[in-house]
C-alpha cells in the first residue's frame, strides 16, 4: 500500500474550483494510478474529514513546442471531493 501523501499531489486553485467550495467540493491533482477508494481514504486520513463522494477525470497533456522540438505536457488525473455536511478542509479557508 502506498503512503497517503503520495496519492494527493496538490490542490487545484482556479476560478472554477473556488466556486465549487460553496458546495463543499474540493479539487485536487492526484496520482494517475489511484482509484476512488484510495483517494477517499487519503483525504480522510490527511485532513481528518468525512468524504461523501469522489469524482475523477483524466486530463490529457497538451502538445507543446520549444522551437523546432515537439513534446507534450504530462497527462494527469483530477479528483473533485465532496465532503459530508459540517466538514471543511482548512487548507482552503480564506481563499
UniProtKB/Swiss-Prot annotation:
The answer to whether keyword NAD applies is no
InterPro entries, alphabetized: Nucleotide-bd_a/b_plait_sf, Ribosomal_uL23-like, Ribosomal_uL23/eL15/eS24_sf
Keyword hit for Oxidoreductase: no
Q: Name one GO molecular function term.
A: rRNA binding
Domain of life according to the entry: Bacteria
Pfam families this protein is in?
A: Ribosomal_L23 (PF00276)
Q: Which Gene3D superfamilies match?
A: 3.30.70.330
Which GO CC annotations does the UniProt entry carry?
A: ribonucleoprotein complex; ribosome
Give UniProt keywords alphabetically: Ribonucleoprotein, Ribosomal protein, RNA-binding, rRNA-binding
The record's Gene Ontology biological-process terms are: translation
State its role. Answer: One of the early assembly proteins it binds 23S rRNA. One of the proteins that surrounds the polypeptide exit tunnel on the outside of the ribosome. Forms the main docking site for trigger factor binding to the ribosome.
Quaternary structure, per UniProt, is:
Part of the 50S ribosomal subunit. Contacts protein L29, and trigger factor when it is bound to the ribosome.
Family that this chain belongs to: Belongs to the universal ribosomal protein uL23 family.
Task: Give the protein's recorded name.
Answer: Large ribosomal subunit protein uL23
Q: Which organism is it from?
A: Syntrophomonas wolfei subsp. wolfei (strain DSM 2245B / Goettingen)
